[in-house]
Swiss-Prot record:
Family: Belongs to the universal ribosomal protein uS15 family.
Disulfide bonds, paired cysteine numbers: none
Broad class of the protein's primary localization: plastid
Protein name (Swiss-Prot/TrEMBL): Small ribosomal subunit protein uS15c
Species name: Lolium perenne
Pfam families reported for this sequence: Ribosomal_S15
Amino acid sequence: MKKKGGRKILGFMVKEEKEENRGSVEFQVFSFTNKIRRLASHLELHKKDFSSERGLRILLGKRRRLLAYLAKKNRVRYKKLISQLNIREQ
């Protein structure tokens, strides 16, 4: 992972970000994954932060729904995305 502008960006997403393709399902899942990882590390330190825990559950649900949509529409892109983001298949 590279650090760019205060955000972590995977190499394969840099190209898409430059093209302003922020509405794609892949970019949205990538963005949610970064937020989820950041919140998870926050919750390891602050175990009683229940509002952040709720936010994490909401983000997980949004990402799950987007992944289900992508898996239904294009299985190849779905498999590629989950392998690049290193998230397990659901």
